[in-house]
Design a protein with these regions (language model features):
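Boundary at the C-terminal end of the N-terminal hydrophobic targeting segment
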Residues: 20-25
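Edge strands and adjacent loops of beta-rich recognition modules
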Residues: 165-169, 332-333
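Catalytic cores of secreted or luminal carbohydrate-active enzymes
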Residues: 312-333
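Accessory beta-strand-rich segments of carbohydrate-active enzymes
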Residues: 53, 58, 93-102, 114-118, ...
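Bacterial N-terminal signal peptides
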Residues: 8-18
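Positively charged n-region of N-terminal signal peptides that target proteins for export
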Residues: 1-5
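Pro/Thr/Ser/Gly-rich low-complexity, intrinsically disordered linker/stalk tracts
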Residues: 26-60, 144-149
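Recognizes extended acidic, P/S/T-rich segments that occur
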Residues: 55, 61-114, 124-127, 132-136, ...
Length: 333
């Protein structure tokens, strides 16, 4: 009798485990989380965010499963993300099959701030049990917001004022600054017209070329965001910024073919570095009159031709730049 009861109990436990495994295999989990169709992006607009993911099954290939609800949670740190009461925003459980470009509907997010987020979904088994409970939370992802128009304190600088021709040699800007402690995080926001290349302590920050994107400079100027903490150290540090004309300053050259010409002004740059130290304090470094300008190694540049000299990229000394906003520019994007 005892043996029969034991066997019955074993079979019952096995059946429950099988049911549990089957139910677990029929729960979808968000994976490959994206913000604005990018993975862990830097410099996203804080009020126009969209969230996306793909659906992952614990036992592929899954069939007859679909999402019927979702929940998104955002926080300022991974520790806060794990505690619901400390979340910056929680969407709550939303009945929806959408998992593509879901708009953010919370309060205004802080500019130049890194946020962490995760999602979970509810699964419907179309030929079986119907709706079941929400599944596990996804692995965390992150995004970093851009600067808003009120957060810019840097000034546009140029080697010469607009309207004054300083010859074909393009400028290089140099600036030395000191960091008082070890760095926890550092965000660099930069634009250069028409194009720029930024070096920090001798290392190239810009991993792409022809930055920033071409735009109607009378209305919009684009800028880029970089995370540069690994390039910084306590004590003295140095910036070097190389500028190019791009499509911002295309001038006719005697004896050379020009598809089109047009100038919005002299090459110029705008840079803002926001540093947070390990002790919790912060510091900011901007382009201003303390920077030094030098004649750069590029002695002639057009969209289809470049002439480079062999002089050093950044020399000591130099002259202070002039402060000059882009002609007609109304906003940064």
């Amino acid at each position: 009798m005892m043996r029969t009861a034991s066997l019955l109990l074993i079979h019952l436990l096995a059946a429950l485990l099988c049911c549990s495994a089957e139910a677990g295999s029929q729960v979808l989990t968000p994976a490959h989380l994206n913000v604005d169709l990018q993975t862990d992006p830097l410099g996203v607009a804080s009020q126009d965010l969209t969230f996306s993911w793909i659906l992952h099954s614990a036992r592929p290939p899954a069939r007859d499963l679909r999402q019927t609800g979702y929940r998104i949670r955002i926080a300022r740190s991974l520790a806060q993300l794990a505690r619901p009461k400390n979340a910056t925003w929680d969407s709550g459980r939303v009945a929806s099959s959408t998992y593509w470009q879901i708009p953010y509907t919370g309060a205004a997010l802080e500019p130049a701030t890194t946020y962490y987020w995760k999602a979970q979904v509810q699964t419907e088994v179309q030929h079986g049990e119907g709706n079941i409970a929400f599944g596990k939370w996804s692995h965390p992802a992150r995004f970093t917001t851009s600067l808003d128009k009120n957060s810019w304190s840097a000034r546009w600088i140029a080697a010469t004022p607009d309207g004054q021709d300083d010859g074909p040699v393009l400028p290089v800007f140099r600036h030395e600054f000191n960091l008082k402690a070890p760095v926890e995080s550092a965000l660099l926001f930069v634009s250069g017209l028409g194009q720029y290349e930024v070096h920090l302590n001798g290392r190239n920050v810009t991993q792409t070329v022809l930055n920033p994107g071409w735009s109607d400079y009378r209305k919009t100027v684009f800028y880029d965001t970089y995370s540069v903490a690994p390039l910084l150290h306590p004590g003295p540090n140095a910036f070097g910024v190389l500028l190019g004309n791009g499509m911002y300053n295309v001038q006719r050259t005697a004896g050379r073919y020009s598809k089109f010409t047009g100038s919005f002004g002299q090459p110029k740059c705008l840079l803002q570095l926001m540093v947070r130290y390990t002790d919790g304090s912060s510091q900011q470094f901007n382009t201003d009159s303390s920077w030094q300008s030098h004649p750069g190694p590029i002695t002639f540049r057009r969209p289809t031709a470049v002439r480079i000299s062999m002089q050093p990229l950044c020399q000591q000394g130099g002259k202070p730049p002039v402060s000059t906003p882009p002609i007609g520019s109304r906003r940064l994007k």
